[in-house]
Amino acid sequence: LNHLYLAAQLVVLPGALIFLWHRSKPMYERLRNTILATWVLSIPIYAAFPVAPPRLAHSGLVDTITTQTGLSLDSSLTTSFYNELAAVPSLHVGFAVVIGMAVAAAVRNPVFRFAWLLWGPVIGLAVVATGNHYVFDIAAGVVAAGLGYLLGAAVARMTPRSPVREPALARA
């Protein structure tokens, strides 16, 4: 579960965007807009209401990522790349849900489609089991991603599209 937690943002998110760029440009644009809008909505929440994850609450939970992978989430190098007090909303889960839905909509195989729909719940399990989020954080992440989807869709509707130019025919 530790590796899933780490891979969710570092590997799967960019991989899904690249896959959708090649498979379905409209789905790529929807996912990209949702991710960006969700970030825009969530950053002020992180700044206004810093919330520690369970592993920092001194409640007896062990930081399984540090103990099982050797990566310390508390090191000065690691904390320079992420805010350890940004537990609510859980964007790991919010993003995993929208990634799963977007990729599921783009794949044809029903088994892969079903598997991608499970991506969000699997990441939800991983973030709780690794002591990085409470269940409330998961719900807040899903709500944030839903609002991000709505905001991203609204911005896309308001953005004028430039017409696609046909290549000029060569004249002899």
Language-model segments: residues:
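C-terminal membrane module of polytopic membrane proteins
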Residues: 130-172
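Interfacial helix-loop-helix junctions of multi-pass membrane proteins
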Residues: 53-60, 83-87, 122-148
